Swiss-Prot record:
Gene3D superfamilies: 2.40.50.580, 3.40.1350.60
Protein name: Sugar fermentation stimulation protein homolog
Gene Ontology MF annotations: DNA binding
Organism domain of life: Bacteria
CDD domains: SfsA-like_bacterial
Family of the protein in this entry: Belongs to the SfsA family.
Pfam hit, one: SfsA
Organism: Pectobacterium carotovorum subsp. carotovorum (strain PC1)
InterPro entries the UniProt entry points to: SfsA, SfsA_C, SfsA_N
Amino acid sequence: MDYTPRLQPARLIKRYKRFLADVVTPEGETLTLHCANTGAMTGCATPGDTVWYSTSDNPKRKYPHSWELTETQQNHWICVNTLRANTLLYEALLENRVEELSGYSDVKTEVRYGTENSRVDLLLQAPDKIDCYIEVKSVTLLQHECGYFPDAVTLRGQKHLRELQQMVSNGKRAVLFFAVLHSGIQQVSPARHIDSRYAELFTEAQRAGVEILCYGSTLCPDGITLTHKLPLLG
């Protein structure tokens, strides 16, 4: 996924009201950015970090600038825009870069499924294959050399695990895909210490046959690419 035009840098002053952040540009101008991330963003929003932002040409947007990446003071790169994870996997599927999900001729997005009024992130179909339902999660929380999901209690994420497990019960293929969008993360684990119920449902879903895939990425102001498989812990 390319950023066109290239992202612009600024220094983070603070994040507030969940969806907003104030930054100062190299020229000294203060801007308010939109932040498309409802999580805690632990370790991703430290004042003084370098923020990389995009600018929309939509005149109707109240906040035309969007926070895309954080370059931390520890030299890690993090994609904080959770909307990018789906796009990254979609592009990787079209380019046949995820071996475990290859061989499907049709990729659909936001298809209704399940029993809890959900829309699946991606649905893969092919005449000779079982339908494959994929939920995509962005992993950005780094603690003790491990990446954790979620970074806050997520009822929505719990629902998705139930829906995926139901798809397996219905004879379909179901995949939980962790897109690791933090350059410092080399392994992934469910965050039992943050959302114990999510971790319980994660274990139940995995035992029921839901597949778990974790892929790392390369990140820079020019773009992001899913590149390599990462190990899953517990």
